Swiss-Prot record:
Membrane topology, as annotated: Single-pass membrane protein
Name used for this protein in its record: UDP-glucuronosyltransferase 2B9
Localization per record: Microsome membrane; Endoplasmic reticulum membrane
Function: UDPGT is of major importance in the conjugation and subsequent elimination of potentially toxic xenobiotics and endogenous compounds. This isozyme is active on C18, C19, and C21 steroids, bile acids, and several xenobiotics including eugenol, 1-naphthol, and p-nitrophenol.
Keywords recorded for this protein, A-Z: Bile acid catabolism, Endoplasmic reticulum, Glycoprotein, Glycosyltransferase, Lipid degradation, Lipid metabolism, Membrane, Microsome, Signal, Steroid metabolism, Transferase, Transmembrane, Transmembrane helix
N-terminal signal peptide: 1-21
Record GO terms (molecular function): glucuronosyltransferase activity
Classification via PANTHER family: EG:EG0003.4 PROTEIN-RELATED, UDP-GLUCURONOSYLTRANSFERASE 2B33
Any one GO biological process: bile acid catabolic process
């Protein structure tokens, strides 16, 4: 090949490499568990496009090992909490959340808030460890990052963005009760037709369901506004040396990338600096490991069922494990069950246990007939992407809400983990597998997920690059952030107009009384004459 053509090919390759513009520097405030999985997908794509990504993680972080090779630069800061302590606390609180008394609203709600406050205290201590580390802060300042990227459910990134005076992009699934979205992002969630997250309601609510929705909304607002947010307000004010609030600081975010989609979420208004990127981690299935593929193929026409309750549920009680195993033994399908514990006594020959499964690849296999899931958003999006109907066994957090959404859309059935029997699970599985309506409904959602002009991952990366190119996206930020609560609701305007009307009525009444008094006086004078 001539030197000329070699040069042309090299230039073309370079043009693709730099197609996103000049490469930028991204500072990431680390998240944990499924929150990190979604962020990592975006960050790896940014690295592929030539950007430099630095992840700021505590020494207690569960998912980060600085000794492992990675395209991401990991900046570890010391903290008093050890990795083991943090993981134990996380597991304890998750277990506590799963066991919350769901039949008593106020008890359930108050205990759930205590769990969230405890996590809030831990994250706040992590944040204090960062901003008080002068050597680290100087190093970060001198690195001259172009953007901060984070999940706001782990606050602190907005404080770093404020201290370094750089733009901020959020990646978020949800916050309990849409607290941060409403009070910090200015999102609109009319309670008349938008169900509060974790309420397990749909957008078609009866009067009493709207009452329940309003109570949920007010309860979340009260608990978070009156207690937890005050701690953050005080901390941020101390660090910045001026009065401020978490809402004000978070409200300066340039872009909110919400890990949701309209085939999952119920319709509601969106602001111009918000984009839905749900399912960004989904991808075509890869070939299965040889042993697993042989087991799947041995299922014949009946196919297989994939079963996973997520990575945060370990050591299932023997009684529950035996109930589930007994149910799975009653169906003709082969079952691949992600399970880490003692082998159930009732385990059937059609079921195999795995400590880990390639979930996305299994869901994308043509022989997969159903997915038994705890209702985590990542798993549900993968099931939608590949068109697999679901049996939901939600445990905590947004999982009951996610399954409620899928049930409303006719793509899933639901069971209660604590009360379901073997017969219940077997019957629900047979219903989902044998009733073609469930497959049709989930395939409709799948077609919608695939029918997008730009893939969710590409949109997410575009907005981060957009913010880096333009040094922010303030032109998309609504002016509502600059208004007080009474200005936002136009209470001052309403008060002024009411005062004007009252003044006019007062003047008219005074004029009428004056005229009446004049005529009355004139009438008396005429009689006396």
């Amino acid at each position: 090949m001539s030197v000329k053509w070699t040069s042309v090919i090299l230039l073309i390759q370079l043009s693709f490499y730099f197609s996103s513009g000049s490469c930028g520097k991204v500072l990431v405030w680390a998240a944990e568990y499924s929150h990190w999985m979604n962020m990592k997908t975006i960050l790896e794509e940014l690295v592929q496009r030539g950007h430099e990504v630095t992840v700021l993680a505590s020494s207690a972080s569960i998912l980060f090992d600085p000794n492992n090779s990675s395209a991401l630069k990991i900046e570890v800061f010391p903290t008093s909490l050890t990795k083991t302590e943090f993981e134990n606390i996380s597991m304890q609180e998750v277990k506590r959340w799963i066991e919350l008394p769901k039949d008593t609203f106020w008890l359930y709600f108050s205990q759930m808030q205590e769990i969230m406050w405890r996590f809030g205290d831990i994250i706040r201590n992590f944040c204090k460890d960062v901003v008080s580390n002068k050597k680290l802060m100087k190093k970060l300042q001198e690195s001259r990052f172009d953007v901060v990227f984070a999940d706001p459910i782990f606050p602190c990134s907005e404080l770093l963005a404020e201290l370094f005076n750089i733009p901020l992009v959020y990646s978020l699934r949800f916050t309990p009760g849409y607290i941060f979205e409403k009070h910090c992002g200015g999102f609109l969630f009319p309670p008349s037709y938008v169900p509060v997250v974790m309420s397990e309601l749909s957008d078609q609510m009866t009067f009493m369901e709207r009452v329940k929705n309003m109570i949920y909304m007010l309860s979340f607002d009260f608990y978070f506004q009156m207690y937890d947010m005050k701690k953050w307000d005080q901390f941020y004010s101390e660090v910045l040396g001026r009065p401020t609030t978490l809402s004000e600081t978070m409200g300066k975010a340039d872009i909110w990338l919400i890990r949701n989609s309209w085939n999952f979420q119920f319709p509601h208004p969106l602001l111009p600096n918000v984009d839905f990127v749900g399912g960004l981690h989904c991808k075509p299935a890869k070939p299965l490991p040889k042993e697993m593929e042989e087991f799947v193929q041995s299922s014949g026409e009946n196919g297989v069922v994939v079963f996973s309750l997520g990575s945060m549920v370990t050591n299932m009680e023997e009684e529950r494990a035996n109930v589930i195993a007994s149910a799975l033994a009653q169906i003709p399908q082969k079952v691949l069950w992600r399970f880490d514990g003692k082998k159930p006594d009732t385990l059937g020959l059609n079921t195999r246990l795995y400590k880990w499964i390639p979930q996305n690849d299994l869901l994308g296999h043509p022989k997969t007939r159903a997915f038994i899931t705890h209702g985590g958003a990542n798993g549900i999006y993968e099931a939608i992407y590949h068109g697999v109907p679901m049996v939901g066994i939600p445990l905590f957090a947004d999982q009951p809400d996610n399954i409620a959404h899928m049930k409303t859309k006719g793509a899933a059935v639901r069971l209660d983990f604590d009360t379901m029997s073997s017969t219940d699970l077997a019957n629900r599985l047979k219903t989902v597998i044998n009733d073609p309506l469930y497959k049709e409904n989930v395939m409709k959602l799948s077609r919608i997920q695939h029918d997008q002009p730009v893939k969710p991952l590409d949109r997410a990366v575009f907005w981060i690059e957009f913010v880096m190119r333009h040094k922010g996206a303030k032109h998309l930020r609504p002016a509502a952030h600059d208004l007080t609560w009474f200005q936002y609701h136009s209470l001052d305007v309403i008060g002024f107009l009411l005062a004007c009307v009252a003044t006019v009525i007062f003047v008219i009444m005074k004029c009428c009384l004056f005229c009446f008094w004049k005529f009355a006086r004139k009438g008396k004078k005429g009689k006396s004459d």
